[in-house]
Amino acid sequence: MDFSRQSFHRSLSSSSQGPALSMSGSLYRKGTVQRLGAAPSVYGGAGGHGTRISVSKAVMSYGGDLSNGSDLFGGNGKLAMQNLNDRLANYLEKVRSLEQSNSRLEAQIKQWYETNAPSTIRDYSSYYAQIKELQNQVKDAQVQNAQCVLRIDNAKLAAEDFRLKFETERGMRIAVEADLQGLSKVYDNLTLQKTDLEIQIEELNKDLALLKKEHQEEVEVLRRQLGNNVNVEVDAAPGLNLGEIMNEMRQRYEVLAQKNLQEAKEQFERQSQTLQQQVTVNTEELKGFEVQVTELRRTYQNLEIELQSHLSMKESLERNLEDVKARYASQLAAIQEMLSSLEAQLMQIRSDTERQNQEHNILLDIKTRLEQEIATYRRLLEGEDIKTTEYQLSTLEMKDIKKTRKIKTVVEEVVDGKVVSSEVKEIEESV
């Protein structure tokens, strides 16, 4: 686009430096009209580049009092009227040129707004909805994290309960093992007693065999003694039958030995059976305890695996939460950066709009003053009071347009190549 903001501002500045109206060359003074020289450019800016309002040179100078206005139209009054007509034509041409420049500038401003400025006010409701959605997602993640923490606490409590049960069962297992060791000692004692009883039975059998042998030897000795004796027949009471007596004694000893042996066997069998039953019961209990210990060990391993899985899931959720927080923080920083940039652009657009409004007001003021000057010349042509004209022209001549200068400073804070914050400072000073 051919329109340049700098050139436009520079032209307006140059146009606003001088007075509103400059009666070039000469001024109307009270009582005299001095010689009019060549007039330089009255307005060189505001779109009227190269436009000059020239005034014809007067051939003669006037003197005397112009309060009555009689000499203005007499003698050399025709030259003055011709000069005023030329100046009026130049002013009218200047007015038309300024109107055309104003129209052109308005078209350029409108075109610039259409190309640079947004056609409508930006609607940030979509960003608000996105921010609300992100906040809801963060809240959901926090709720899920709290639920995971609660599940982890429950798992820890369950693991603690199982640990207590495991300690209790381990104490019971230790007690059962101690009982088994005690029963093993009892079993060993019974085995020793059995061995002692077997040894005693063998010794008794040996004693019985020895007694039988000694008895047989004694019987043989007695028989030999009886065989060597002389038979003497006397009338006496019949003697004792030693053989029968020995047989009876032998039978009684055999019955007694058989009875003792039978009782020892029965007692040994009873004790062995009782011990065998106890060993069987203890073995079954030991197998049951071993099964329970195996199940508890398996349960403990499963709980340990579950605890490790929960811990890994917790770590994963914490990492995901940190990633989500970092991502949302970066997105929020990007949104804030974009909002700051948009606010800076909006402030820039507002300042440009205000500056262009001021420039437009300056142009309107120039146009108004030109219209006032045209009206003044019209009244001069119609023969109005010259004193009033002189006073108005002097007032317009002495009135200057204030020139102001705006200094705009943009301060941006950059972190890791990203704009974190942006601040626009604007200072207005008069020149």
From Swiss-Prot:
PTM annotation, UniProt: Hyperphosphorylation at Ser-13 occurs during the early stages of apoptosis but becomes less prominent during the later stages. Phosphorylation at Ser-13 also increases in response to stress brought on by cell injury.
Linker 1: region residues: 113-130
Q: Which GO terms describe its molecular function?
A: structural molecule activity
Annotated region (Tail) at 385-431
Please give the residue ranges the record annotates as the region Coil 1B.
Answer: 131-222
Which region ranges are annotated with the description Coil 1A? 77-112
Residue(s) carrying Phosphoserine: 13, 16, 26
Q: What are the IF rod domain coordinates in residue numbering?
A: 77-388
Q: Which GO terms describe its biological process?
A: apoptotic process; cellular response to starvation; intermediate filament organization; regulation of protein secretion
What tissues contain this protein?
A: Expressed at low levels in the more differentiated suprabasal regions of the small intestine, and at higher levels in the colon, mainly in the upper region and in scattered cells throughout the remaining epithelium. Also expressed in epithelial cells of bladder, ileum and stomach and at lower levels in pancreas and earskin. The phosphorylated form is nearly exclusively expressed in goblet cells of the small intestine and in the lumen-proximal cells of the colon (at protein level). Also expressed in jejunum and duodenum.
| Pfam families the record matches | Filament
Alphabetized InterPro entries for the sequence? IF_conserved, IF_rod_dom, Keratin_I
Q: Which Gene3D superfamilies match?
A: 1.20.5.170, Single helix bin, Vasodilator-stimulated phosphoprotein
The record's misc note reads: There are two types of cytoskeletal and microfibrillar keratin: I (acidic; 40-55 kDa) and II (neutral to basic; 56-70 kDa).
| Similarity annotation | Belongs to the intermediate filament family.
Summarize the subunit comment.
Heterotetramer of two type I and two type II keratins. Associates with KRT8.
- What's the protein name? Keratin, type I cytoskeletal 20
Q: Which organism is it from?
A: Mus musculus (Mouse)
Q: Which gene encodes it?
A: Krt20
